From Swiss-Prot:
PANTHER family reported for this sequence: AGAP004664-PA (PTHR45970), HOMEOBOX PROTEIN HOX-C9 (PTHR45970:SF1)
Gene: hoxc9a
Chain coiled-coil ranges: none
UniProt source species: Takifugu rubripes
Similarity comment: family membership: Belongs to the Abd-B homeobox family.
Role: Sequence-specific transcription factor which is part of a developmental regulatory system that provides cells with specific positional identities on the anterior-posterior axis.
SUPFAM superfamilies the UniProt entry points to: Homeodomain-like
Keywords recorded for this protein, A-Z: Developmental protein, DNA-binding, Homeobox, Nucleus, Transcription, Transcription regulation
GO molecular function annotation: DNA-binding transcription factor activity, RNA polymerase II-specific; RNA polymerase II cis-regulatory region sequence-specific DNA binding
Disulfide bridge map: none
GO biological process per UniProt: anterior/posterior pattern specification; DNA-templated transcription; embryonic skeletal system morphogenesis; proximal/distal pattern formation
Name recorded for this polypeptide: Homeobox protein Hox-C9a
Amino acid sequence: MSTTGPITNYYVDSLINHENEDVLAAARFSAQGSHPAGPRTTSLVPECADFPSCSFAPKAPVFSTSWAPMHTQPSVGYHPYSHQPHLATDSRYMRSWLEPISGAVPFHGYPGNGRHYGLKPDAFQEHRAGDCLGSTGRTYADYLYCTADIRDKTHQNIPSPEPELVASGKHKDEKPELDPNNPVANWIHARSTRKKRCPYTKYQTLELEKEFLFNMYLTRDRRFEVARVLNLTERQVKIWFQNRRMKMKKMNKEKNDSKEQ
């Protein structure tokens, strides 16, 4: 076996086990190919003889029934999921996906196309259509398809808020805000605290004139009685008598001046 020369091809080839190479090649190509390979050789079987053979029980299928094809229905848009009937009445919103629905509520004045898409149940009400034009008895359809004269009359009937705004602006300009720290401005725009004058009626004036002819000065008891009869206060009776005496004095003075001249 000991040779001084290089190892020849015949010697190397004799050391390689060609039988094992054929078995490994057959196993590799049988795993990659679609067709099962033939029975393996018994050269590798003794290595796994100590292990018992594994047997698995067949598992029940997950889905007992077979899959049925879904029914296709005409739709406008994409359906992310199927409709759930138990949520149709209790949910706050109606269908949130695009789907043609029969018996939809059309707009007033527009032809209904039998479709409505994801609207709230209270989106349309019966009395909303006549809110703006309900006073004139016309609907939106009459307003859209009517002539220009009727539209002009409708605009003329609507009151314009501009005069009210102008009047309120003038009213604000006439009453400027007063500065509480400026005494001059407060004095100029000061209001009198005197009460509004309450004139006497003809009946009250006549009765007071009669009482003045009898007595120019009233006692307290008589003043109380006159005030009670004429439905006046004692202060009103007192002031009237004071003014009447001043008027009488002035008239007497004018008479004396006229006589001297």
